[in-house]
């Protein structure tokens, strides 16, 4: 018999109508803004699966825009997120797409465009009960759920990186909730994802994110 928590049975506190289509969507967009650079001038929401079919009726569209604006799922401002985005000068568009069978039906690819013509994107999936997971960042397959503060690092395959990061964290009395690596066999680039039990101090941010060996170093605080 499977045990369920009260949260899983009752769902999160949120602006409705659907925990999957609004709360999860809002969280995806909110976390995505912590991953990319912050000087984007347009956001495109590419909706996949059931998101693509029901995004207007279920409020997914307003929840996504609200998440980009930094709102939490229980923030009443989600109801007026379109109007607030206009006031903030945020340009956004919605399109539908097929990301493929490997993606959860409630998935969205959020593309951030910058004044210099460059783009970044984040793919996230709403997996029920207001929970979500980020599954791809700029073509790198990863998985984290935004439940813990998370360090994201990319680097050419080499020894000592994991021990360097983990020793810094444990030496500063951090608990590592999860640590995962994925390697691109074509480029030998490794993606390291580390979830920790509390936010990084400024000194640890510098010690970890400021190291030259990392081609990408990002931090998402929860």
UniProtKB/Swiss-Prot annotation:
Keywords: 4Fe-4S, Gluconeogenesis, Iron, Iron-sulfur, Lyase, Metal-binding. InterPro entries: ACT-like_dom_sf, ACT_dom, ASB_dom_sf, Fe-S_L-Ser, Fe-S_L-Ser_bsu, Ser_deHydtase_bsu. It comes from Peptoniphilus asaccharolyticus. Its EC number is 4.3.1.17. PROSITE patterns: ACT. GO terms for molecular function: 4 iron, 4 sulfur cluster binding; L-serine ammonia-lyase activity; metal ion binding. Belongs to the iron-sulfur dependent L-serine dehydratase family. It catalyses: L-serine = pyruvate + NH4(+). Binds 1 [4Fe-4S] cluster. It is an enzyme of class 4 (lyase). The lineage of its organism: Bacteria, Bacillati, Bacillota, Tissierellia, Tissierellales. Residues 150-222 form the ACT domain. Heterooctamer of four alpha chains and four beta chains. This is L-serine dehydratase, beta chain. It comes from the Bacteria. NCBIfam families: sda_beta.
